[in-house]
Amino acid sequence: MALDRYAALHVSTPQGRGDGRPTADQVLRDQDPLGSHWSDKVILITGGTAGLGAESARVLHKTGAKIFIMGRDIAKGEKVAADISASNPDYPPIEVIQMDQSRLESVREGAVEFLKRSGGKLNVLMANAGIVASPVKETQDGFEAVFAINYLSTFLLVQLLAPALVASTTPEYNSRLVVVSSAGHRASNIDPDKYNLVGEGYDPSKAYARSKTASILMANEFERRYGDRGVHALSLNPGIIMDTEISRGLPGTSASRREQYYKMEPLLAQYEKDVMQGAATQVWATVAKELEGKGGLYLDDVQVAREATHEGQFCRPGWKPWIWNEDNAVRLWKDSLNMVGLESEN
């Protein structure tokens, strides 16, 4: 299957939510990893209690894989899990694990609980959880919240679960780390001398952008370290989706935010996706046969992305060259180990 099989569906001018661009369900039907092919697999989705994470769980549950979702609100997660599981009663029920990504100790506890319940098996880690730009605040661990939640907590979880990914890989299906990032990375590179953007002059948009750049750099460095061990990392931009809870830190309702942003950037009305379309790229990253054995790629619009040729216009696809800076990736990895209290990879 071609890596650009969905490109034609994105070439013509998009018509907004619910247009002809593919949904996660369509991607799954096209790949058809149903029944016994996936019944032996374990998938863990962070931020799986709402939005793109919940939609990914809903679609991937149809494969017959064992699905775990992580989230802060255990009650909300249990309802999502019950609703999805009831729609596919012949498949293993979805399980919920509580994890608050604003607290590193909660990440450690969540990892321990997952490994206990899964028996140490993990074929796909989908790092989906995150928050949007928000007023400055620090976590109890002393890190700026957007950086901690969007990047550092995920880095720690990846370190704790990497051995399970390695142990679970097979020649037929290499284990995958799927990192949900954002086109917002194009607004700023990281500053290796100042990861923690706190204090006077704090810019929430820059903090968000840097956290997303950091996530991509992490995925690329993971690929360099684990690719030859049969585990591959892919990062991606799901697109502009305003109906998810990632925007909970912004004022107003989704409708009022949509109206406000449409005025600021008219292209949003064309490029915005609904949740079903927004989850398509991360589901593709999980099930695509054409991505087997591949990693270190940045995906966008259900295809391998190209360099952005336009300034601004973050609703449009593409990446900035700084996501491929290996020196920054190596330094970020080493610095992150220190920040989360690990001397070396487990």
From Swiss-Prot:
Gene3D superfamilies named in the record: NAD(P)-binding Rossmann-like Domain (3.40.50.720)
One short Pfam name that applies is adh_short
| Top-level division of the source organism's lineage | Eukaryota
**Record: residues binding NADP(+):** L52, K76, D100, N128, Y208, K212, I241
In biotech or industrial settings, the protein's use is given as:
Calbistrin A has been reported to possess a number of interesting bioactivities including antifungal active against Candida albicans and cytotoxic toward both healthy and leukemic human cells.
InterPro entries found in the cross-reference section: NAD(P)-bd_dom_sf, SDR_fam
Relate the induction remark in this record: Expression is induced in complex medium (Czapek yeast autolysate medium) supporting calbistrin production.
Q: Where is the active site?
A: S181, Y208, K212
Compositionally biased residues, Basic and acidic residues: 18-32
**This protein's pathway:** Secondary metabolite biosynthesis
Query: What are the record keywords, sorted?
Result: NADP, Oxidoreductase
Listed EC numbers: 1.-.-.-
- Per the record, which residues fall in region Disordered? 11-33
Q: Drop me one GO molecular function for this one.
A: oxidoreductase activity
Q: What general EC class does the enzyme of this chain belong to?
A: oxidoreductase
Could you confirm whether the keyword NADP appears in this record? yes
Please report which protein family the annotation says this sequence is part of: Belongs to the short-chain dehydrogenases/reductases (SDR) family.
Q: What does this protein do?
A: Oxidoreductase; part of the gene cluster that mediates the biosynthesis of calbistrin A and related compounds. Calbistrin A is a secondary metabolite with an interesting structure that was recently found to have bioactivity against leukemia cells. It consists of two polyketides linked by an ester bond: a bicyclic decalin containing polyketide and a linear 12 carbon dioic acid structure. The polyketide synthase calA is probably responsible for forming the decalin moiety.
* PANTHER family, per the entry: NAD(P)-BINDING ROSSMANN-FOLD SUPERFAMILY PROTEIN, RETINOL DEHYDROGENASE
| UniProt name for this protein | Oxidoreductase calI
Organism of provenance: Penicillium decumbens
